[in-house]
Regions:
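A short pre-motif secondary-structure segment
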Residues: 136-140
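Short, charged helix-capping/linker segments at alpha-helix termini
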Residues: 2-7, 21-30, 40-59, 72-75, ...
Length: 185
C-alpha cells in the first residue's frame, strides 16, 4: 500500500510548503525537485558559472530549509524563495569582493570575450554587465519581478532599480547587436 509521500508529486505546492514548515523532509525534497532547475538557472544568469551556480542554489535550499518555519504565508513561497536566492547571491558578491580587496584584485574585472567570430549568447552578454545591472535585469526579465519587488528584494532605491534595468537592457542590446552583425571590438 502506498504511503502518503508517494502522492507528493501530485500535491499542490502550498500543501507541500505547509508540510515542510512542520518538518516533513519528504515534502521539502519534492519542493526542491520542483524548484531546483529554476533556482539553478537564476544563479547561472547571475554568475555565468555552472559549478558556482549549483553551489549557490544548494545554499539557497539549505537556507530555505533552515528558515521555512518562519514563512508566514505559504502562498508567498515563490517570492520568498526568490528573495532568498537574491540574498545568497548578494552575500556571495560581498564575500568575493572582500576577498578581491584583500588580494589587491580590481573590482572592475569582467568576463573575458570569446575570440572574434564566435557568437555571443545571452548569458555571455549578461556577464558583461556590471553586477548591479545584471541583477536587476535578470530579476525583471527572467523572473518577471516588478521594479518595486526588485527594490524591496535588493534594498536598492526604486529609481536606481529603474535606471539599472533601462541602462542594462540598452547595454545588452548593444552587446548583442555587435555580435549579431559580425562586428568585433
Amino acid at each position: 500500500m502506498p504511503g502518503a509521500r508517494d502522492y507528493y508529486p501530485e500535491c499542490p505546492e502550498a500543501f507541500l510548503v505547509s508540510l515542510a514548515r512542520g518538518g516533513d523532509r519528504h515534502a521539502f525534497a519534492e519542493i526542491v525537485r520542483r524548484r531546483q532547475s529554476s533556482i539553478r538557472n537564476l544563479m547561472r544568469r547571475f554568475c555565468n558559472d555552472r559549478p558556482l551556480a549549483d553551489d549557490l542554489a544548494q545554499q539557497v535550499f539549505l537556507k530555505v530549509w533552515l528558515n521555512i518555519r518562519g514563512l508566514k504565508k505559504v502562498e508567498a513561497f515563490g517570492g520568498w524563495l526568490r528573495r532568498i536566492a537574491v540574498s545568497v547571491w548578494l552575500h556571495h558578491l560581498r564575500h568575493r569582493d572582500a576577498l578581491r580587496g584583500a588580494s589587491g584584485l580590481s573590482g572592475d574585472e569582467r568576463a573575458t570575450r570569446e575570440t572574434a567570430g564566435v557568437a555571443l549568447d545571452l548569458d555571455r552578454a549578461l556577464a558583461t554587465l556590471p553586477e548591479a545591472e545584471r541583477l536587476c535585469v535578470v530579476l525583471s526579465y527572467n523572473e518577471g519581478m516588478s521594479h518595486r519587488e526588485i527594490a524591496e528584494t535588493t534594498d536598492l532605491p526604486l529609481g536606481t532599480v529603474k535606471s539599472h534595468i533601462r541602462i542594462g537592457a540598452r547595454r545588452l542590446q548593444s552587446e548583442l547587436d555587435v555580435y549579431a552583425g559580425g562586428n568585433t571590438r
